[in-house]
Amino acid sequence: MTEFENLTWLHGKPQGSGLLKANPEDFVVVEDLGFTPDGEGEHILVRILKNGCNTRFVADALAKFLKIHAREVSFAGQKDKHAVTEQWLCARVPGKEMPDFSAFQLEGCKVLEYARHKRKLRLGALKGNAFTLVLREISDRRDVETRLQAIRDSGVPNYFGAQRFGIGGSNLQGALRWAQSDAPVRDRNKRSFWLSAARSALFNQIVSQRLKKTDFNQVVDGDTLQLAGRGSWFVATSEELPELQRRVDEKELMITASLPGRGEWGTQRDALAFEQDAIAQETVLQSLLLREKVEASRRAMLLYPQQLSWNWWDDVTVELRFWLPAGSFATSVVRELINTIGDYAHIAE
């Protein structure tokens, strides 16, 4: 299995180094739900600005403040402790009056707004995230500038970031140990983290192998394609290849790669053979996903950061701004720019 730091680069390995996240203010994330609260209902959506607090800690504190069980507070995604983040929490408070959130006191946190909502906010139920990152101690400004222009035009690999695999790859190692044991894993969080790490590692491997081909973004017979910004996909046939290629070149369609698991992978013929060959050596992880009945799915191979802009504060410091759809990793953008000083796995997204 190829380690995250050695996965194939779309724009070649960066020439220079730099520092990501010297302090929390260098990594700012603003959650974009993609909808506005209903204004009525038994749930309350609370938008919180936090610095130095992880999401679960804040959710538990909010539950205590509202005098409800911790399971009644949900969120769409985990946000990093060591960053400045804005995100929405959702509390189920049927039959209760609107609380006075000005009385909610938690160091590093501030309630920005709140409103009633009809539905629970579930994990993954957000449109995306807006990022503002500051990269420091950059050793090669010219190379980074060239890469930013290339990323604006051609995107980056849609890799799952090192955070998915845990500090030192602990989640992936856990998955491997579990796969080779008959002992059940009863901890739901561990099960979720380990299965997610296993499937993500296989996806990354497939994408990395495809990027080694000079024509990696050329549609082949049996590829599965996805409308940009949509979840559904369809299979390419040989008769359609010229027209489908035109739509891929115009970024209207995206070539996808497999999230392996139980059931059909989606690809057929030439594309399926390539994906199977790319992870043929990873039988242990594939067997785990089948044993635990994880359903196969698809994910776009490339990621195009939206609203990408940058501002050089000086020759060694640049501020980046961009928006990514839910499930994408800012660190997968950064790894195409610089060889980072520090451990990606400490940055949750």
From Swiss-Prot:
- Quickly give the catalysed reaction: uridine(13) in tRNA = pseudouridine(13) in tRNA
- A GO molecular-function descriptor: tRNA pseudouridine(13) synthase activity
Show the active-site residues. 80
Describe the location of the TRUD domain by residue ranges: 155-303
* Keywords, in A-Z order: Isomerase, tRNA processing
Under the heading Pfam families, the entry gives: TruD
Q: What's its top-level EC category?
A: isomerase
The cysteines covalently paired via disulfide bonds are none
The highest taxon in the source lineage is Bacteria
User: Which SUPFAM superfamilies does this UniProt record tie to the protein?
Assistant: Pseudouridine synthase
Q: Which GO terms describe its biological process?
A: tRNA pseudouridine synthesis
Record GO cellular component, one term: cytosol
- Known Gene3D superfamilies for this protein? TruD, catalytic domain, TruD, insertion domain
Residues annotated as binding substrate:
27, 129, 329
Q: Give the EC number(s) under which this enzyme is classified.
A: 5.4.99.27
InterPro entries of this UniProt entry? PsdUridine_synth_cat_dom_sf, PsdUridine_synth_TruD, PsdUridine_synth_TruD_CS, PsdUridine_synth_TruD_insert, TruD_catalytic, TruD_insert_sf, TruD_pseudoU_synthase
Q: Which HAMAP family match?
A: TruD
The free-text function statement in the UniProt record for this protein reads: Responsible for synthesis of pseudouridine from uracil-13 in transfer RNAs.
Question: Which family does the similarity line name?
Answer: Belongs to the pseudouridine synthase TruD family.
Descriptive protein name: tRNA pseudouridine synthase D
